[in-house]
Structure formats: structure tokens, C-alpha cells
Amino acid sequence: MYPRHDDVSLFQRFVNDHKLEEKGLPLYQLAQLEGTDQVMLGVDGTKIIDMITQAVREREKMAIYTYTTPYTVYEKINEFRTMFQSIKNCTPVFVFNGIQYSPDSAEEFGREKNVVPSEVAALTGTDSSRLSNTTNVRFAEIHKKTANRFVVEEDVEGQIIRIFRSEFKNTIRAPYLAWAQLSSFRHCNHRHISEVYGCLELLAFPGIDRVVTNINPTRGTFDVVYKARVLEAARLSEEDLSSLILVESRSRVMRTVTLKFSSLEDMIKKVVRYKGSTIGASFAQQLHEEAIRASEANRMRASNQRGAAFRNLSAFASPVLTLTPPHCLPLHFLYGIPGFPHADAESFVGLPLPPVLYYIMSAGLLSPSLFAAVSQETVVDDWPLVDSIKYRDVAETVLPLRVQTIYQLAWTMSRGLGSISWFRRYNVLPARVSKLHVPPAIQLDGWALHSVTVPRGLHLVDVMEFAHLACSVDQVIYNTMEETYAAILLQSLDLLGYLTHETQDLHEEGQSSEPSTFGRALQLCSVPTLSEYTVLLIELARTNAISTEPFRITTEEVSPRDTPRDIVFASRVLSIIPLNVSGPWTAPIDAELAAFSMLSRMISRSIRQLLEAITTLMFSKGRTHVPLHRIGEIQRLLPFSTPVEFGCGVLVEYMLMKDKCTLKDLEEAFPECTYLRHDLATLFYFWDLAVQVLQRIETKENFCVDQHCLSSANERMKRAQKNLNILTGVRETYY
């Protein structure tokens, strides 16, 4: 949950005050790409995410306690889909942001922003905890603050991009900044788009003469802001305007600089130009000098402001992809912007990566934070919903996997990594950043799959039948998509510890590898589409994330929860199973389950990044004959692509807490769950599987869960299943 600033920029106010937005132009006036009859519309992913965020905050104010991916996200995506498909002879080119700025260890974040209000902490998934009961005046301020906490995090953004890519093939991630990449698409030698739709900040970039700010498909019109009109109204050069727009931007992808000006005109008037620099650069230099003169008490804040200003100006130096050598270069090099004073982007976005890695990332289906960690030599945590002791413990437990994943990717580059830093999102500032040791090098094995028939559409449990085919990685190159994908899953499971083996030569006979205890537990899953959740369950148990202890989710004293421990246990185990929903959540909520989901998401994303790193290694090291341009097909198949939800945990909690709960009770309490009987069949099947899995991985050395609590929870679940009359055969369970 990232901190977010929503105040309007001075430039936005300037455009509004001077009525510089031309409204109601007919859609046929959208420019076509030269030599074609198509409008190639560059779509700014920053604006897409901003509009989705705003829609969720308005329509689902308590979203952070209901869904990981709120229902409004899908509604808004559908609105965009309808809008762009309604424009005749228009091909949208979606460009989303890639690697973000390097983290700032001095970033301010208050304790009150990642705790739960006591009124919300008291809601425990029962009838009295229904979201519809929180619409009174007492909750009005809570709704407002809670709504502002919602942001689209990386895993949800990845889901959004996957949906857009399934509808629009021209959907990519920029190496760094989407605005810079769209600017490069307007360069005379690399022109791929004829118009841009997005944020006003696009006017700061070369090659962009106007920005489409709104499209009304019903009326067949669009609104637009011309750079020429802005320059005329502001009486500025293009360089001055560009620097001003960036330095005072309030976009989520930029750093907020505190301004002491009443308007853009006031800023232009009062900033003293520094040695021929632009106004924006002069203001940044002014902040630099103020930081030098600042008192000890104010020096850190002044230094942060200076850094934010220079960081925003470095957007002009963002590397962009091109189809011609060198394939990736800073934007200001592409346009030949002379005398650019802050072109060194390395201090802000990290060291450059090999162009092939940017190309692999450009498909939009991989996590930019994985590549950012290699580039910036920093492992960055997400902002937690609640900064709890359990969250910190699990984060430390998962860290070795995350670090090993990063080094596996880094070792493929000619430039290795030294000691990297761990950047934690904790309330305690001194505890945020620490150095990490270089992990032991792990040589991943290969898999002799050429001698077997590998089917399509494999899931994690399916590849376990090939567990005995391990071989030296240098002895095998995969020939087909199926072999390559199976090898990616096997290598990932191997690094996670689901296989135990001694590598033998291909010519030697006998079994060289076999499933470990965790691998045999995974093989208990007879519904392959649920094997992803089986792995997640095992990893939650291995990291001791599944417990019955309450989370400290508020700074205020609240009445102790009276939820029995075995119900807490069952609801957390089953919270990872998704529900089919058809609308915004109005059912009961439980903030503790929302806090627990942060652990599930952390582990899920860590496994996902491992799979992504192995996929990248497979292609960048030439271990497959599958052409590089088909890597997107494999990326689409990778598991752990959908953000982990937690609504099922609330459903289980309600079901077990309500005496003799009936299907009608559940349908009334959870009206959004339109396939409830089917979801319950999946839920009870997975519970039976979870009991077997947790018992299988339990050893004297590894007490993953409280077996007494597991047994008690199992008895409750059996009674509930009998009372609801839910069948759990394989035919009834499909995902």
C-alpha cells in the first residue's frame, strides 16, 4: 500500500484556469499515421492506472478490506475496452511503466497510514460486520481515509496489463517511463504512433505536440491540449515548459516537491534562472543551495526535496526501446537534446541492463521490480496494509528466496552483483535499510525431456511425473514450447526444494532425482488447476505464516476477538482460494484476513518472480530453440499470475461462526458470489487436500502448523459440509 499524493499540479491548474483544453472535437480529426489509414493511438498506461485507481476510490471506498483486485478494476477495464474498440480505424498502443525510480531510504511514511481504524478492527466476518452496515455518519471519515489508501500495486497492475494484452496485441511495458517511450514513438525516425492519449505530463516530452485528454465514444468526440497554445499562454520556451511540468508533477510515478508558489505564473516569476539553465533546473539548483544552507534539523527534508526535483528532471534521460541499434538508449540521446544538465539517470533508476532483458520485459507480463532489483541492487518490499510483527517475520523468512532469484538473474549478465540492500517498508526509519550478503551460488539442473512426450497446458503438479529426468544443465537444449515450459516449472520447483536428486549423465541409467517431502505433498493434488494454490499453501506453512495468533492491526485498544482458534486457522488456510463474484463487495469483512492476505501475496509474488527469472534465464542463456519473440506465449502460461484474494476466508469464517449455517444464509450474506455452490465444492475439496498436505509435510524438525488446531478445524469443516450438503468430487471441482 504505497503513499500517494493527490493534490493538483500547478500546471494542471494553469491549463484549467486558461481554458487550454479544447473540448468536443470530432473523432475523425484524430491524426492517422503517415502512409496509412489508421489512427495509431499511443495510450499512456499511467493515465489508465490513475483512472482505475480513482474509480475504485469512488465506487468501493473500503476496497482494501474486501478485494485484492476490486470488482471496479474489471468494470473500468471493460469501459476502456469499449471506448477504444468503438473508435473506427484506430489501433491503440498501450504503454505501461516499467522499472521505477530507485527507492529513497528517507521517504516519509506515518504510522497512522498502515494501521486499521479501531472501528474496522472490531469487524470479524459476522452478520454485524457487513460492509453495508458501515454507511452511517460514524464511518464517513473512515471511508474517505480508507479509499485514499487504495493504490494499484504491481501484482494487480500485472493483472490489468494481461487483460489489456489479451484484447489489444500492442500492449507493452516501457523499460522505465511510459511517457518517455511514447515520446520515442513520435520521433521522426521511429514514428509508430500518430496521437497520444494520457496525462498532461506528456506535453513535457519532445515529439508530442498535443495530448488527447478525454474520449467520448457516445458523442463521437475527444478533448485535447495543444503544446503550442500552452507555450503561448505561458510565454515560455519549450525547454522551460518541459522542465516546469516535470519538476512540479504530482503524478504517482514522480516524486512530490513541496512548492511555495501560488500558481505556475508565480513560480515562473520568482525562480531565479541559474547560469542559463531552464526554469525547472534552476529551481532544482535553488533547492540544492537551500539544502546546503539548511539547519541540522531541516537538512534532511531540504535534501529530500532537492533529490526529488533532480529525480523528476531525470525523466528526460529515461532509456527507451528502439527497433534499430543500440535498441535501448536514453531519450535525450535519441532527440539530441543539447546541454542537458541532469542526464545521468543511473543514480535514479539504476545501472543499465542488457537490451535483451528490456525486450523480454516489454511484453508486459513480467514484474518490473525483479529487473529493478538487478539494476538498482536493492530488494524492495511493498507497503503493508498493517506493519505487524508477523508481516516482518514472514518477510525475513521469504527474503533468501527473493535474493537467490535476483542473483540467478544477475549471474547471467557480464556484470555481477556485489552486496545488495534490503529496503523494508517499516514504520521505524532506522530499520528500513540493511545490507545483504551474497547468497551461495546454486547451479540449476536441466531436464532430459527429449525422450518423453510433453503435453501442452501443464500445471505444477503435472510436471512432477518428470522429476526423475534431471541432468546437467549443459547437456540439454529444449526444442519445443512444451519442453521449455515444463523445464521452467521443474527448475523452479527444484530451487524451492520440491525435488531431491543427484545429477547423472544422460547415458547413465537409473533414477537421478525424485520428489522431496514437499513434492510428494504437491502430488496429492488431483485437480491440476488447484496445484498452484497447493504450492502456495505449502509455502505459507514452511514460512510459518499460517498461525492462529491475532494481528496487532490498530494502535488503539479493542475488545479481544472471540473467534475460536480453529476457525481462524481454517479461514486463513482457505482465504487463498478465489471466489467467483459479480459485483462490488457488500458482504461481511474482516481486517485481520485482509492483513493475512499480505503474507499470501508476498509469498505468491516471490514464487512468481522465481518463475519469471527462470524463464528469462532460459531464453537469455540460449537453453531453448524456441524463438525469443514467442517468450510472451510462455509468460502467459506461468502460474501465480493472478493476485491472491482473501474473500473466501471471510466466507469460511462466516459459515463456521453461524450456527447451522445454510446455503440460503450464505447467499443472503454474500450476494456477490453468484456461483456459490460451485465455489463451496472447490473450497471443501481444497480443505480435504490441505489437511492431507499439512499432515504430510509435518516432521519432528518442522512443526508447520498446530496439529490439534488442524484436527479441530477439520471436524468443524466436516460438519459444515454435511449441513450444506456439498459434494466435492473432481467433477464438482474445477478451476
From Swiss-Prot:
SUPFAM superfamilies reported in the protein's UniProt record: PIN domain-like (SSF88723)
Assigned GO CC terms: cytoplasm; cytoplasmic stress granule; cytosol
Pfam families noted in UniProt: MKT1_C (PF12246), MKT1_N (PF12247)
Effect of loss of the gene: RNAI-mediated knockdown in the bloodstream form is lethal. RNAi-mediated knockdown in the procyclic form has no effect on viability.
Primary residence: cytoplasm
Interaction with PBP1 as annotated region, ranges: 475-722
GO biological process: post-transcriptional regulation of gene expression; regulation of translation
GO molecular function: 5'-flap endonuclease activity; mRNA binding
Locations listed in the record: Cytoplasm, Cytosol; Cytoplasm, Stress granule
Keywords noted in UniProt: Cytoplasm, Translation regulation
InterPro entries hit by this protein: MKT1_C, MKT1_N, PIN-like_dom_sf
Described function: Involved in post-transcriptional regulation of gene expression. Promotes mRNA stabilization by recruiting a complex containing PBP1, LSM12 and XAC1 to mRNAs. Recruited to mRNAs by sequence-specific RNA binding proteins. May regulate translation through interactions with the EIF4E6-EIF4G5 translation initiation complex.
Subunit architecture: Forms a complex composed of at least MKT1, PBP1, XAC1 and LSM12. Within the complex, interacts (via C-terminus) with PBP1; the interaction is direct. Interacts with RNA-binding protein ZC3H11 (via MKT1-binding motif); the interaction is direct. May interact with RNA-binding proteins CFB1 and CFB2. Interacts with the EIF4E6-EIF4G5 translation initiation complex via EIF4G5; the interaction with EIF4G5 is direct.
Family affiliation: Belongs to the XPG/RAD2 endonuclease family.
Protein name per its UniProtKB record: Post-transcriptional regulator MKT1
